[in-house]
């Protein structure tokens, strides 16, 4: 196969340049397809209302819901992180993906029905209705925005930068800024519907490219049996450092783990202990899949509850594939390129990938640039760009929703739809600017622990949120005081672990971290279990010692009362009163509310084009504002969780089938 290589003077300095017509044509065709879908959604969907922009008008059927859930979850961090951890330690990291098969069913069957009957757009808004007060909603909004910027965006930016460096040799800043610009354009212009349609397209691009590369990789290594025959012998030949403080490196630092072929590992000595993987990971996954804005927003856009459940099942089936499309190819990359992917000498690793702690993160990009022929190499670049753009676009849109609905409306409670839409789009621009400013930090933090980084940060900050959401949905006795102080207490515990670990660093086998054992010895997933239990006990204890919330405020806000027909007195009703309506306080009201008419001269042609581009043209609807009866009918439709019994049985049987498949695979690779 033809390769375009610039030979460097040292190991790791080779640059494969995608400068041939076949690769360029594939990349151009992909971008034209994505832009075309985004423009189509601009014409097709209603972006002139808050509900239309943020919830896709509640019109999505099951297959784009499921594809969007999967595409929003699978970013370039998964390609780089899962393959890298697979190269470093074997199959166990796939447990992060297969655990989601069960948790995503909890989302569709237990959590989403309550979110729908509550009539909310954002998760902090649900807690506002459930508990009253402002401090929980504000706390969760700020925490979510913090996690978006410093974990999700940073991971995607880092992993995208790794791939671009390996595949293109372009300037990192120019490449990533261009990607962010394109992502921002179709996020700002298209709203959630554009994201969900482009997510669907990109899901197929991601899977097609990953399947092709997996086929090449298995062919190169000698098939499935060749992988398991050769992986334990995949060791670097360079094991002596010129640094006197390092010298001869212990074989335990460069030999593959003896338990590399097992998902469930020793509870004490394992790098992913099985109790932590089964329990601690479920807690962190529960936060991500059941209360994270990026994921839940996709479900809330579903046509009805049956379509949402079917979408969750489709997402679950898709989550079976990363083991075979990412983890195993990462292991194959170590077999094929042990001196690069499995490097252990600090100065060698520095030359190969720019960091001294290890280069396992280049496992997947290395396969692409070494194995793929012209055209297909361009396809894989398009796959990685699709993953990066999909994940970033999801974060931009969802963080825009959070900021607009949960923070800005506290500052401007009487803001109309037009102002809220404008602020939401400006927030996307601000997030892009922060992302670009964060690039030097991400580049300086290139280490061998990408997937551990995101999971550990989540384990230190997410369990209190998981505990509060679980208790909020299933324990009516929990009140605002208990929930708030449970969150605060959990945050303090998490920071007590997070700050020392990042101050001392995670270290490596060659140069272990100096972090005191009292703070850093406990595995981060074990710590997640401890943090979840402590936060839950604190929340329950304070709730039981203080006054309960009367049941009249809880109808359709807790799981046991999701079918209640009683009229609910919302604890946030004070925000709905006043001379001017607040369009963001009811999940259905804003979905039917058109932008307020402004008596002003007709805008010129240029301004009309700009307003249409941003989804703010008043001529798009072609109909008068809805009547009070129409608003009420729309609200009832959005909060309806009734299902056709026949289709409900179909999705229930499919859920059982998916769980059976998942249990078999867990047992087979245990």
Swiss-Prot record:
It is a multi-pass membrane protein. This is Sodium/glucose cotransporter 2. Expressed in epithelial cells of early proximal tubules (at protein level). InterPro entries: Na/Glc_symporter_sf (IPR038377), Na/solute_symporter (IPR001734), Na/solute_symporter_CS (IPR018212). Belongs to the sodium:solute symporter (SSF) (TC 2.A.21) family. One of its GO terms (cellular component) is apical plasma membrane. It is found in: Apical cell membrane. One of its GO terms (molecular function) is alpha-glucoside transmembrane transporter activity. The chain crosses the membrane at residues 21-42, 62-83, 92-112, 135-164, 172-193, 194-215, 274-293, 308-329, 374-404, 423-444, 450-475, 481-503, 522-545, 650-668. The gene is Slc5a2. Electrogenic Na(+)-coupled sugar symporter that actively transports D-glucose at the plasma membrane, with a Na(+) to sugar coupling ratio of 1:1. Transporter activity is driven by a transmembrane Na(+) electrochemical gradient set by the Na(+)/K(+) pump. Unlike SLC5A1/SGLT1, requires the auxiliary protein PDZK1IP1/MAP17 for full transporter activity. Has a primary role in D-glucose reabsorption from glomerular filtrate across the brush border of the early proximal tubules of the kidney. Keywords: Cell membrane, Disulfide bond, Glycoprotein, Ion transport, Membrane, Metal-binding, Sodium, Sodium transport, Sugar transport, Symport, Transmembrane, Transmembrane helix, Transport. The keyword Metal-binding applies. Disulfide bonds join 253-509, 343-349, 353-359, 515-520. Glycans are attached at residue 248.
């Amino acid at each position: 196969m033809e390769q375009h290589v610039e030979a460097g003077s040292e190991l790791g300095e080779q640059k494969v340049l995608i400068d041939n017509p076949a690769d360029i044509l594939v990349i151009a065709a992909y971008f034209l397809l994505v832009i075309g879908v985004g423009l189509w959604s601009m014409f097709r969907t209603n972006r002139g209302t808050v509900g239309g922009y943020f919830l896709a008008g509640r019109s999505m059927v099951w297959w784009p819901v499921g594809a969007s859930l999967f595409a929003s979850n699978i970013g370039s961090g998964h390609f780089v992180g899962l393959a890298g951890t697979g190269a470093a330690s074997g199959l166990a990291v796939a447990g992060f993906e297969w655990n989601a098969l069960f948790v995503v069913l909890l989302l569709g069957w237990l959590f989403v029905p309550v979110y729908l009957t509550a009539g909310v757009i954002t998760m902090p808004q649900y807690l506002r209705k459930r508990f009253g007060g402002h401090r929980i909603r504000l706390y969760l909004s700020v925490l979510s925005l913090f996690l978006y910027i410093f974990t999700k965006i940073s991971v995607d930016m880092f992993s995208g930068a790794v791939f671009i460096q390996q595949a293109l040799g372009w300037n990192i800043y120019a490449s990533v800024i261009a990607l962010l610009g394109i992502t921002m354009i179709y996020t700002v212009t298209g709203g959630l519907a554009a994201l969900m349609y482009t997510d669907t397209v990109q899901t197929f691009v991601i899977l097609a490219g990953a399947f092709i590369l997996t086929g090449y990789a298995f062919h190169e290594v000698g098939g499935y049996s060749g992988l398991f025959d050769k992986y334990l012998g995949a060791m670097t030949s360079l094991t002596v450092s010129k640094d006197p403080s390092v010298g001869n490196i212990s074989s335990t630092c460069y030999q593959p783990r003896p338990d590399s072929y097992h998902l469930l590992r020793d509870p004490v000595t394992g790098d992913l202990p099985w109790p932590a993987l089964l329990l601690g990971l479920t807690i962190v996954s529960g936060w991500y899949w059941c209360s994270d804005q990026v994921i839940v927003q996709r479900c809330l856009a579903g046509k009805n509850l049956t379509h949402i459940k079917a979408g969750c099942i489709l997402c679950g089936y898709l989550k079976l594939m990363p083991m075979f499309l990412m983890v195993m190819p990462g292991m194959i990359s170590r077999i094929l390129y042990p001196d690069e992917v499995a490097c252990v000498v600090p100065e060698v690793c520095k030359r190969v990938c720019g960091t001294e702690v290890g280069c396992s993160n280049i496992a997947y990009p290395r396969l692409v640039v070494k194995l793929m022929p012209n055209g297909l190499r361009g396809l894989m670049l398009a796959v990685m760009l699709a993953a990066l753009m999909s994940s970033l676009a999801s974060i931009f849109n969802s963080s825009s929703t959070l900021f607009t609905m949960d923070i800005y409306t506290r500052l401007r409670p009487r803001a109309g739809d037009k102002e809220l839409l404008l602020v939401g789009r400006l927030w996307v621009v601000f997030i892009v600017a922060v992302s670009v400013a964060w690039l030097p930090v991400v580049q300086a933090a290139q280490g061998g622990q990408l997937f551990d980084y995101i999971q550990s940060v989540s384990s230190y900050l997410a369990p209190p949120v998981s505990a509060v959401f679980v208790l909020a949905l299933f324990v009516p006795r929990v009140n605002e005081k208990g929930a708030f102080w449970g969150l605060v207490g959990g945050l303090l515990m998490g920071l007590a672990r997070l700050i020392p670990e990042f101050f001392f660093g995670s270290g490596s086998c060659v140069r272990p971290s100096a972090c005191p054992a009292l703070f850093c010895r406990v595995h981060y997933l074990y710590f997640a279990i401890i943090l979840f239990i402590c936060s839950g006990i604190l929340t329950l204890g304070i709730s039981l010692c203080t006054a309960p919330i009367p049941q009249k405020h809880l109808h359709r806000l807790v799981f046991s009362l999701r079918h209640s027909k009683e009229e609910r007195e919302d604890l946030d009703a004070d925000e709905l009163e006043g001379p001017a309506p607040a369009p963001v306080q009811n999940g259905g009201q804003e979905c039917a509310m058109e932008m307020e008419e402004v008596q002003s001269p007709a805008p010129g042609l240029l301004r009309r084009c700009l307003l249409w581009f941003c989804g703010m043209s008043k001529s798009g609807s072609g109909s008068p504002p809805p009547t009070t009866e129409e608003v009420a009918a729309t609200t009832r439709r959005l909060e309806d969780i009734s299902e056709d019994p026949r289709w409900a049985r179909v999705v229930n049987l499919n859920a059982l089938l998916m769980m059976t498949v998942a249990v078999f695979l867990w047992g087979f690779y245990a």
